[in-house]
Amino acid sequence: ISLGLVGSEMCIRDRDIIQGTCFRDPISIIAGDYEDARDSDIVIITSGIARKPGQTRLELTQTNVNILKSITPEIVKAAPNALYLIVSNPVDIMTYVFTKISGLPENQILGSGTILDSARLRCGLSEHFQIAQSNIHAYVFGEHGDTSFIPWSGAYISGVSVDEYYDLEKKLGKDIEPIDKEAMLQYVQKSGGEIISKKGATFYAVSSSVCKLCSLLVSSSESISTVSTMMHGEYGIDDVCLSTLTLVGPNGVQGKVPMRMTKAEIEQLKKLSLIHISEPTRPRLIS
């Protein structure tokens, strides 16, 4: 693993990671430059300033876009065949900009998108229903941020819709309240900001989600995940990066997986997709 860190002071900062490698499988960690990433299989881009308490992801936009523009030519030159995983916030805009300026095929580019948001949703539903997260299939679509939304028509617990599962639990004599869907959405959207306000940053859940995505990209089989990719007419949305169900694997992005949603949900997704990266702002972002 080559950490994209430039400067001698970064060698000290990554020492904390290096000294923990004895407890894991053999791995090499270095603080290097672009040349050290030559011919990489996967490049993870996390460059940019971090969110401060009370700050939204979108407020990071111009600064982080400028940083991304400055590093893209060099990293793409060093690793033109790599799969690129964009994690920097605001991740959907960053994925859009990288897709537009890198010149790489779109199957090589994906953003971490709402994979963490979907995990937070599963966590919230697990806590509410007192059921293992592995039994829950529910997803967050759209932007990784305050305009994400939950297509509840596609939320299931072991093949049973969330609404029907509540009725089932009541019949079994469980003491359980109806799920407050708006409160659950707020739980998903605000979790990151609340954690940042208490400890300064999010580390563990986001790093776990990135590791999971990397495992999908090196797996011998394909998997479906809510990653951010360029939309080409799916659900009536075009020329914007956001998260829907996407088939990913060792060859990167294989395509979108259409999920049956209600007309109201599709219209909501279309409406929200225009908020975080409106058409008038797109040329300015990539110029």
What would you call each of these model-derived segments?
Residues 54-58, 258-259:
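Short acidic, glycine/proline-rich loop/turn micro-motifs
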Residues 8-40:
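Conserved N-terminal Rossmann-fold NAD(P) cofactor-binding segment
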Residues 1-12, 276-283, 287:
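Short, small-residue-biased leader/transition segments that mark boundaries at the very start
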Residues 56-123:
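Rossmann-like NAD(P)(H) cofactor-binding subdomain of soluble oxidoreductases
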Residues 47-49:
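Conserved NAD(P)H cofactor-binding loop of Rossmann-fold oxidoreductase domains
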Residues 44:
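N-terminal Rossmann-like NAD(P) cofactor-binding module of classical short-chain dehydrogenase/reductase
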